[in-house]
């Protein structure tokens, strides 16, 4: 399944006609904006260390579409295979050269389905990602808490030692003062 998805995606990314150039550039802009939004949301979730890494929006967009097709075919099974899943069985609405008159309407329906699926899969993956991030943060917080507890115990021992030394010196001074 995954091997067949890559060549079909490459074929669909190439625009053969002049009229499709406008639609293709609009689709590319949409993919870039969706990829940028996802990248921004992921960077907010991952924190400052992950923000430093920069990813090419076109690479993210093509990887997301490929992952969408693979994940969708695994999750939904045969129900959606003929309904416009990228890399699965052919669909007349997905390729503009087969239906030139109604290609814009069919393409927008295909893109809406693709974006909805992308949003669903993205949320599931983000939930898993958020859980992993929370686990790591919980581990770091636990380690820091252990360190602070050890530090607190050490300070408590030092305070007790200092207090006993102060008390013993006061008693010694009192005894010496009384002897004079």
UniProtKB/Swiss-Prot annotation:
Residues 77-108 are annotated as: Disordered. It is a single-pass membrane protein. It comes from the Eukaryota. Its main location: mitochondrion. Residues 84-93 have a biased composition (Gly residues). GO terms for biological process: apoptotic process; negative regulation of apoptotic process; negative regulation of mitochondrial calcium ion concentration. Residues 96-107 have a biased composition (Polar residues). GO terms for molecular function: ubiquitin protein ligase binding. Disulfide bonds: none annotated. Interacts with BIK and RNF183. Interacts with IMMT/MIC60and EMD. Involved in the regulation of endoplasmic reticulum (ER)-mitochondria coupling. Negatively regulates the ER-mitochondria distance and Ca(2+) transfer from ER to mitochondria possibly implicating it in the regulation of apoptosis. May collaborate with RNF183 to restrain BIK protein levels thus regulating apoptotic signaling. This is Fetal and adult testis-expressed transcript protein homolog.
